[in-house]
Structure formats: C-alpha cells, structure tokens
C-alpha cells in the first residue's frame, strides 16, 4: 500500500510481504539511481563481550555469498557498470548503499537480496575481516593524536553500561574472542527483512521501483520469531570532567551536553540551531589561527534513545583551553 507523499520529496512507501519497508523517491533529473539498505542494528545493540559486531558486519557483508558471489565481487560488480558502493555503521543502524546508472538498478537490488539471504559467514571470512577492522582501529584511532577523544566523550557522557557508552569501531579483545557461532547468531538476529528499510532514489518511476523491490528483496524469506527488544539506558547527568595527560604538543578540549532523543519533538534544528550557532560564534571569535588554535564548531549526534551536542577544539594552547568553558557557557545562554 502506498503511503502519503511529502511535498519536498515524492516519497512512495510500501511494505513487502516479508516485512521489509520500501521507500521510492523518483527523480527524473538524475541520470542514475541510489540504492540504500538500512538495517536497524548498530553498536547500541551489542551485548557486553561482543563490542564491534555491528561494525564487523559492515565488512563481512562484502565477503561474498553461499550462492556463488565471491569475496569482494559485490563491489567489483557495481564498479564494473560505473557505479560505487560503500557502507557505514552507527549506534542505531548499519547502512549499505550503491549509486549506479539507471539501467543497473536491478543489478544492485539483486546483489542486496543475495547478501541478505545468502551471506557467507565463514571462519575464513571472519578471520580476514577481523584483521581488517583491527587495522582500521589502529590507523584511525590508536595511532592518531586525539584519536580516542570521542570514545572518552561517550564514556563520560553516557557511561560504560549505556548502549551508547562504547564506540562503534569495537573492542579488540572482543573481536579476538569472537567465535563463528556468536557472529552467526548476531547476523541471524538482526539481518532480516522485517528489520530493514530499502530506499531507492533517482531515475526510476515509483511503480517500477516498488515492483523491482518486491521482485528481488520480496523473494527473501520472512524471518521467524520476534526481534529483540532494544534496551534504553540512562543518560548520565553528573557532568563528569575527564582529564587525560599525554605527551602531545597541544591540548584538546571537548564539551558535550546530553540532548533529547531524535524522536522527541523538542529535538529540532529549528529549535536549537540558534544556540548551536552562538556557541560556534563564541569559539570562532576567540580563535587564534596564527597560534595554532583550531576551533571546531557545534556538532550534534541525534540518536534513538538520546543525543549529544559536542563543541570544542582539537588543537589549542593552554590559555585557549582554559577559556573554552566560559565561552561555551556564554554561547548556551
């Protein structure tokens, strides 16, 4: 059944028999089409001891299928028709996306259906992708100055027991200890049609997009049993102050405020945008580029259960670090 269309975007919605939700946005001005597959699973759904599983599957989903698609062939096939593909993991979702010429839409949908229904979760693929993720963590976090700043912020803002209290990149000890049975169970629990939203946007008519979605993704068998109930954690309100001393040439400062969840009607950019702008203006007005100060304006993370508003600088001198609290307080008023 088609849902209502918005005035800004021609959004046509349907739910397939297996529970998958589909959204089609026709845009005849585009020569290509984008396919986005959203799974409602992220690092917030990981159990203790399994930190990093959601992000691990971002990589495993490109490792081939039991139906004959070889490892890395998904990406190579998309690129062979002039398209691109990638994926991302966050706290509440994992997203896989392709952009292809309009004539390759069926190819992209077939590939998505194949890896949803027939993903090759094997010991060999697990071993390979585990090392890929560990190397990514070393390069982007462990061996980068201030690389774990956001991790410290999460722990300080939410606490280690909150679903948002650990980073999506995962834990190396947990990844090293991961066995095939645990990884397979995570996949079968969350990667199912009724936990997915397929979005098709670009050079495609609404009826054609919905028909093709049903042809390929609708053929994936429905899952049995209910999805797990997601646990909502409590946000910390004790406003901890964390100081880490390291042999780095300059000081990094970040402040974070708890904000309402994304479903809260108060959590709108229209309502809070002016305040965020004032905070950024305060930082920029007092920056000293010639002295190595590098202010970072407001950034926000709106999530299912809670959000954060972060502001700070990744490279400031001691006098600027001391004044950051006063200036951000002034911007909040």
Positions of PLM-derived features:
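An aromatic/glycine/proline-enriched structural segment found at the starts
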Residues: 2, 160, 164, 168, ...
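N- or domain-start disorder-to-order transition segments that initiate the globular core
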Residues: 2-31
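M16/MPP (pitrilysin/insulinase) zinc-metallopeptidase core fold and M16-derived inactive scaffolds
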Residues: 34-99, 166-167, 279-294, 307
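Acidic/histidine-enriched segments that form metal/cofactor-coordinating
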Residues: 39, 66, 73-186, 232-233, ...
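Short amphipathic alpha-helices in soluble, non-transmembrane regions
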Residues: 110-115, 210-217, 326-332
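A structural supersecondary motif
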Residues: 254-258, 278-317
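Extended amphipathic alpha-helical segments enriched in small hydrophobics
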Residues: 312-333
């Amino acid at each position: 059944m088609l849902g209502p269309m918005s005035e800004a975007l021609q959004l046509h919605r349907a739910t397939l028999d297996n529970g998958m939700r589909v959204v089609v946005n026709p845009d005849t001005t585009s020569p290509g089409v984008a396919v986005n597959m959203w799974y409602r699973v992220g690092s917030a759904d990981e159990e203790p001891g399994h930190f990093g599983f959601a992000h691990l599957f971002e990589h495993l989903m490109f490792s081939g299928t039991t139906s004959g698609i070889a490892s890395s062939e998904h990406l190579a096939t998309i690129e062979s028709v002039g398209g691109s593909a990638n994926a991302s993991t966050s706290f509440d979702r994992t997203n896989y996306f392709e952009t292809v010429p309009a004539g390759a839409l069926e190819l992209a949908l077939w590939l998505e259906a194949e890896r949803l229904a027939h993903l090759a979760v094997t010991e060999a693929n697990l071993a390979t992708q585990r090392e890929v993720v560990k190397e990514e963590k070393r390069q982007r976090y462990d061996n980068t100055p201030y690389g774990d700043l956001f991790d410290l912020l999460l722990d300080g803002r939410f606490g280690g027991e909150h679903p948002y209290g650990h980073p999506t990149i995962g834990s190396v000890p947990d990844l090293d200890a991961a066995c095939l049975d645990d990884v397979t169970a995570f996949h079968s629990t969350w990667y199912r049609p009724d936990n997915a939203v397929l979005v098709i946007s670009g050079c495609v008519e609404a009826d054609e997009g919905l028909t093709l979605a049903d042809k390929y993704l609708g053929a994936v068998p429905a899952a049995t049993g209910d999805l797990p109930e997601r646990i909502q954690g409590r946000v910390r309100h004790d406003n901890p102050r964390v100081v880490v001393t390291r042999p780095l040439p300059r000081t990094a400062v970040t402040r974070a405020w708890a904000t309402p969840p994304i479903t809260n009607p108060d959590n709108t950019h229209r309502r809070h945008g002016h305040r965020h702008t004032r905070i950024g203006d305060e930082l920029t007005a007092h920056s000293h580029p010639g002295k190595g100060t590098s202010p970072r304006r407001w950034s926000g993370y709106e999530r299912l259960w809670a959000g954060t508003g972060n502001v700070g600088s990744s490279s400031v001198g001691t006098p600027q670090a001391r004044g950051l609290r006063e200036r951000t307080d002034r911007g909040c008023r």
